[in-house]
Structures are given as structure tokens and as C-alpha cells.
């Protein structure tokens, strides 16, 4: 959600903070602010409603401070106002926060803090509490404060009488940190300081970190020293830049062939799926009674494709659960149940809490995540890292396709281990999977034609996506992409369900994107298309036909390269991504930063 950065060292802090916030802006862009130590020892704050560029307009050009904290906000408590923007300063304390303090009302009453508050935020309550408890010992005060707090939080804190120092502590909400030649860095995401260091560690929960220009020290709540566990990424700052593209989203669409190759290649040996490098033994895939996929948003829709594949091709009972629902229900799991958790960031709060619940019932938990060392990855029994590189655009593209590719690898392994698939069948399946990057490259060349057809879409208020089987699972992601970046109400329906209510919404000119790549239900989908066309729908048909002889069934036909049915969805999703992207830009919108959305949902 919110973006956090802190720095203390030998460089100008303001430049590092504002550059870092710009890199984190996908996590929130309602308001932005920084706090820093002045030469006088006082803490100065600059904050404003708007984006980082608006913050830069009010920053001090001659600011030579070398210690400060910065924040870009996605509003959860209180409206989008200057008073509610971070950092918050109360007395001796300046503080930034990502998370939600659930008992802030009780804290206000218990410590009589109302008179010291000027905002509507739970964050300012935390700052006021720390200031109230402060006795000159920052770490002791922070320990007392966090003992009072309920909810999730990641805090960076400065005390007026501790110049050059930043203190940090977290629960649930993640922060990464490093120390290098330039100084000490902390942030909610590595992209904020990748320019300075590719090494990082994840701040452990309930560990208090003290940052100075000379180093980093950590201790737990009992005062025991904690050593950082450093990791290193294999990408650099250029991977988090647009690199000549107008938006991150279109860049990341083009990166999908490479991303999929990086996901599948290390896990294929002799044309068969192999998870040795992930330290996952074949025994993990044995004696599986059922599979539950738990995720949110796009990751959940990747799971829907996984479900369709695993159930229909490999005969495995699969359910897909929304993480925010699963975590509050009584799970029906046994020690033979496999539960797969999908999250690009590895920090999605509902998915993480669902994992913690599932771990009480089964030892067969597997996560599919992109960020190495993330909390979900660490707490799963096993993890598949997708190696997709940073995804900056809020609307996910390459994270989705690599998650789907991961399900294909898992499905093939399960098919082999269970005996439902022969080695020769598995080799053919994997060889087809290896061709997916080439298929995507071919589809991307159709981008100019997609841009032209979306000119008809920009004036739409509603749109519908239909398909059957894998195509229906794919359609859910297509509809999500369109609605989140173009603000057109879009829904996906199983094509056979149209007559059970949805067809009442079809009227003259309403766009219907029909996906028909599954041979065994192709004729059925065509019949459903005729039904919506008869009601005046503007039909865009995606199919593997080179040409449509009956031109009356659609207004636009997008021909996809020939591919086995199971793999055609990789082609279709690229078209859906391009439709969403060009519809958004055609409306003059910024697809990278859709309203009200943030990239990593780390609060409930």
C-alpha cells in the first residue's frame, strides 16, 4: 500500500528520499512527504496532497541534510488532505507508517491523546503515543508503544534529540533494509534503493532497528541482538525504469516472453518438470487428495486457470479461494491437502494470514511469489520464485503469465507423479510450454491493430468478456484489466450462463470480448456469440481461426497463432492486456497508476 523510505549516511537525503518515493509511487499516490534533520537539530517536514512531483515543488533546493524519512500515501484512515499526509510530527517524534492500527480509538482514550491530534489518521495516534511514552530512550519507548498496538504496522521513526538516527519496527507490513558505502537505507520495497545496493535484508517482525551513518543495529523485544540475513537480487535499476516505453505497463507486456523463460527454464530438465533447484522433492507431489488455491485479484485469476487445467487435464479436485474469505472461515483441509498461495509481492496481507491458517492443518503448502525472501515465501513449506523481475505498473501483466506458467509446471509434475500422464505426454506438454514465449512474441506484433480497434471501446460504459473452460478463466483476468485501468465496468461470464440473467444487460453497441480457443466447446461459444450479436452487441472475437467465413457473428476478429488448446490462453491474455492498455491511454488515463488502487495490498 503506502511507500516508505528512510536514509541516513553520507549523501544528500532529500534527493534519495524523493527519488525513492518516485520509485515507490505505484504503492500509493494520494499524497507524499518527507521529514529530515536540519543543522539546528530540529526536524523539518515537507508534505502535500498529490504525487511526488508535487512534493518536489515545495522542497528546499538548498537542503543538505543527510538523514530523513519519506512516505507516499494510499489513504486508508482519513481523507486525502495535507493534515492526513505523512510524515506526522507530534512533540519530539516524527513518524511514517504503512499498515492499519486497529485499536487507535482505545489508545486515544487510554492515554488522553485527543488534544495532541490534528489529523484523522491512525498513524498520528501512534506518533502521539510514542511521544507520550518517550523518556529519552528510543528503543525502550518503541517497545512500550508496540506492546499497545493492535493491527499491522511498519514504522520509521525519528526523535528530535537523536539527530542522524532512524528507528524502525514492523509487524506484518514488510520493510527491507541495507547498509552500504553510502549509508543505511530502509524502504517498503527494494526498488527505492536498488540504485545504491542490490543487497538487502528483510527486517524481522518485532525487531527494533537503529540506523546511523556508521551502520545498522537490530535487537528483538527482549534486547537480544539480531543479525541481518542479506539477500541479493539479479536485476538492477534499469529493470525498474521505463527504458523508452511510454508506460511501465506496456513495457511489462513486452517483457513477458523473457519473464516466462526465466520462470520455466530452470525447472525443466530433459524436457520434464524438475523442482530440484527449488529443493522440492517429488514426494511433496505424492498422495495429494485435493488442492486449494488461495490468492487475491489477478493472482486469484491465475489460480482459476490453474484450477481449470489441473481439474480437467489431470483429474485433480481443485478449489480456488479468495484469501480475505478463506482466512476467516473454517478450512476443510487434511494432511493430504495441498494449498497453493499466489502473490506477486509475497506480502499480500490476506494471503499471508490465510497461509498461517493453512499451516495449522497441512504440511503441503506451496507459494508462487516473485520477491525473494518475502514473508509468504519464508512461511510456506516450499516456494516457487517466478523470477519475473520488478513489476511496477499497478495492473499486473507479466506476474500473471508467470504464475500461470508455474501452474502448468506444477500440473505436469502432478500428472507424472500420479501416473495420470506418461513421460512422453509430459515431454510434449513441456515442449509446448517452452514455445509459449514465441507465441507471445508473435501476438505482441498485433499491437497496432489492437490500438485501432479500442477506439470504439473508449466511449463504452460497460463491457463483457465471455468464454468456456480455460477461456472463461482467462476472461476473468481480461475483465479485471479493463475495469481497473480504463474505469469501464467490465465483467466476465461463462458463455453458457448468458441466458441465465446476464443477457438482459446486452444492448446496442455494448462491447463483448468473446474468447473461443477451446476446440471441444468452440461451436457452443459461437452459438452464444450469436445470441449477444442478435441483441446488438459489438463483438470482438479471439480465436485460432485464420479467417471467419460467417462475418455476421462478430464485428472484429483477432486471429491467434495456432497452438494446442491449453496454451492458447497465453495468447488470448496478451490481447486482453493490450485492449485494456490502449483503451486506457485512448481515454487519456495513466494505466500505471489507476485511481484508488495500489500495487501491494498489505492492509486488510
What positions do the PLM features span?
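Catalytic-loop motifs flanking and including active-site residues across diverse enzymes
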Residues: 122-125, 302, 306, 402-407, ...
